[in-house]
Curated annotation (Swiss-Prot):
Positions bound to ATP: 202-204, 212-217, 287-288, 331-334
Main location: cytoplasm
Compartments, record wording: Cytoplasm
Assembly and interaction partners: Homodimer.
PANTHER family in UniProt: DNA POLYMERASE SUBUNIT GAMMA-2, MITOCHONDRIAL, GLYCYL-TRNA SYNTHETASE/DNA POLYMERASE SUBUNIT GAMMA-2
EC number(s) per entry: 6.1.1.14
Family affiliation: Belongs to the class-II aminoacyl-tRNA synthetase family.
An MF annotation (GO) of this entry: protein dimerization activity
Catalytically driven reaction(s): tRNA(Gly) + glycine + ATP = glycyl-tRNA(Gly) + AMP + diphosphate
HAMAP family reported in the protein's UniProt record: Gly_tRNA_synth_B (MF_00253_B)
Disulfide bonds: none
Full protein name: Glycine--tRNA ligase
Length: 462
């Protein structure tokens, strides 16, 4: 991203090109809910695959799991979500607007608060600082009430025998409760990790900022189990691995990221160390990726309530202990939003022409190639090339409009390479390939069209 862009520009661009659609649009939509269109679905899957390759598939001690969205409600009792997973809400008596009390304080004062700060302290800070309603500018507040963020539902077919259950607010707990199963069936010794990609649900009071904060979202989480004495080293290793993934693999600009290592007084109750990666979104710097040392908190909590041992036996020392856990956690949509913002650019080509270009790495791009016949008379040859390419690469076919307009369309959706089929192609079996970022062109044999080979050719041509 060459300059700061506003959210409206980003949203309009990705809606217009089929990355996202407003959820339930024909029924006037559902607030802050989005469906991923054809291009958004492709790039989302590409992102998940890159995460899996970097964090899971490339390491022998890493395992993948896919747990249920609905778990026994005792899971959420043990984890503390039923009692503590809530936002402090406060209402303006004048205009009836509702806000998170902690957000009001953070946005209007320099007071230091955290998730352990009680309601009495929060209301005193609001009163002492005479914080006004952002909507009507009055200062007439209700008491603070706690609002649990979990969606509840019921299972069972008979009304008076239905059981209360919850849609999971995070994927982590499904990993914790399967710790023993994974360790036993995979014959795994410490240290080892378990990753999961899956849906989570939070009844957010203030969702918004496009796909940054929604009530339904996907998480990519890892719980890495280790001996407590090894946890600092494991933590630092994940810290470097996340940096490598963001800056080397995804090519996100480092100047758009802040890395915050929180002091102990600002840590969550379960964490002994937390580092957040903040991205410079259109609405400001906000959390992109979290890395936490959760210690023995989760396994101990589940062991205590379930009365089942979640201890690990060191076969060499015969010592039994509850493992420590290091957790890197990122939201798929949030990371995707950062990638799209970072890749979006508006360029001036000459005095009369501009272009919007999405400078995605080829591994993320929805399509790697676009096949563009110069004339309808070349469709048969172009379709032959397309059909061969589709077997090994995701590609698209575009025969509508001038070649210049087709180039611009592919630039705007992030296609790295356009393959132009011209009349000479019928004679020499060669095509012209255009590079998205440099707009340079090279001519190669059809049989030589391969993503890695094309990348190398343009690299050497620069």
């Amino acid at each position: 991203m060459s300059k700061k862009i506003d959210q409206e520009t980003i949203v309009n661009h990705f809606k217009n090109y089929g990355f996202v659609y407003q959820n339930s649009e024909i029924y006037n939509g559902l607030a802050n809910a989005w469906d991923f269109g054809p291009l958004g679905s492709l790039i989302k899957n590409n992102l998940k695959n890159l995460w899996l390759k970097h964090f899971i598939y490339s390491k022998k001690e890493m395992h993948l799991i896919d747990t249920n969205i609905i778990l026994n409600p005792l899971v959420w009792k043990a984890s503390g979500h039923i009692d503590n997973f809530s936002d402090p809400l406060i209402d303006c008596k004048e205009c009836k607007s509702r806000f998170r009390a902690d957000k009001l304080i953070l946005e209007n004062t320099k007071e230091e608060i955290n998730e352990q700060t009680d309601s009495d302290t929060l209301i005193k800070i609001i009163s002492d600082n005479k914080i006004k309603c952002p909507n009507c500018k009055k200062s007439n507040w209700t008491e603070i009430r706690k609002f649990n963020l979990m969606f509840d539902t019921s299972i069972g077919v008979v009304d008076d025998k239905k059981d209360l259950v919850y849609l999971r607010p995070e994927t982590a707990q499904g990993i914790f409760i399967n710790f023993k199963n994974i360790q036993r069936t995979q014959r795994q010794k410490l240290p080892f990790g378990v990753g999961q990609i899956g849906k989570a649900f939070r009844n957010e009071i203030t969702p918004g900022n496009f796909i940054f904060r929604t009530r339904e979202f996907e998480q990519m989480e890892i719980e890495y189990f280790c001996d407590k004495k090894d946890s600092p080293k494991v933590f630092d290793n994940f810290l470097e691995s996340i940096k490598t993934f963001l800056f080397k693999t995804l090519k996100i600009h480092e100047n758009n990221i802040k890395i915050i290592d929180y002091p102990k007084e600002e840590l969550a109750h379960y964490s002994s160390r937390t580092v957040d990666f903040l991205y410079n979104f259109p609405h400001g710097y906000s959390e992109l990726w979290g890395l936490a040392d959760r210690g023995e908190f989760d396994l101990t909590a589940h062991q205590n309530l379930s009365k089942k041992s979640l201890e690990y036996l060191n076969e060499e020392t015969k010592e039994k202990f509850v493992p420590s856990v290091i957790e890197p956690s990122v939201g798929v949509e949030r990371l995707l939003y950062a990638i799209l913002i970072d890749a979006y650019d508006e360029e001036k080509i000459d005095e009369e022409n501009n272009r919007v270009v999405l400078k995605l790495i080829p591994e993320l791009a929805p399509y790697k190639f676009a096949v563009l016949p110069l004339s309808n008379k070349l469709n048969d040859k172009a379709e032959e090339i397309f059909n061969n390419l589709i077997l090994s690469n995701i590609c698209t076919y575009d025969s509508s409009g001038s070649i210049g307009k087709r180039y611009r369309r592919q630039d705007a959706i992030g296609t790295p390479y356009c393959i132009t089929v011209d009349f000479d192609t019928l004679e020499d079996e060669c095509v012209t390939i255009r590079d998205r970022d440099s707009m340079k062109q090279i001519r190669i044999k059809i049989k030589d069209i391969d993503l890695s080979k094309v990348q190398e050719l343009f690299k050497n041509a620069k």
